A protein has these predicted regions:
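Alpha-helical scaffold domains
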Residues: 1-176
Length: 176
């Protein structure tokens, strides 16, 4: 499959399950999918990010070689849909200290941003909680940020995820 063929197939929702199966059977196609998700400006290139997300559900090992590139891409990504998928995928993976350092600042800015949709901010909040689990000294700061967002920029998604994450962080703080 070529990138042009992938673009054509991705245009139709009816082809998405076929593409998932085809890419899982032929992991070389995964790189094409990643390139389309990261670098293409095609209006429906967010579907490539959606496919990466769906494939990750059953084959997370395919994403590992591209995780650092995804972390770099998320900081310049303009599409909220693609950014949401990228942050969700990042939140599901173990991160190096260097990746955590970058993402800590990025996710705080993203969470506090009134310009980002709630779905993007929720995944940024999840990444912050994941980092706090590995770096317990950050728990008080992250708790304050999440609670502030819940108080001042409340949406259903922020409230729902925020309550769960605050409870987990407070429980972790009690163990320190």
């Amino acid at each position: 499959m070529t990138k042009a063929e992938l673009k054509e197939l991705i245009d139709s929702w009816e082809n998405l399950q076929y593409l998932v199966n085809e890419i899982v059977r032929n992991p070389d196609y995964y790189k094409l999918l990643i390139e389309l998700a990261f670098y293409d400006t095609h209006p429906k290139s967010w579907r490539a990010a959606y496919l990466v997300d769906k494939i990750n559900d059953k084959h997370p090992e395919l994403l590992h070689p591209f995780l650092s590139a995804m972390i770099n891409q998320v900081q310049i990504e303009k599409s909220p849909g693609k950014k949401r998928h990228f942050l969700k995928l990042i939140s599901l993976n173990d991160l190096t200290e260097e990746q955590q350092g970058f993402l800590f600042n990025f996710c705080i800015e993203t969470l506090k941003s009134g310009k980002e949709p709630a779905a993007v901010r929720v995944h940024a909040m999840q990444i912050l909680q994941n980092i706090a689990v590995k770096e317990p000294e950050l728990i008080p700061e992250i708790l304050l940020i999440i609670e502030d967002e819940m108080e001042n920029h409340l949406t259903a998604g922020i409230n729902s995820r925020g309550k769960k994450l605050v409870a987990k962080l407070k429980k972790a703080l009690d163990k320190i």
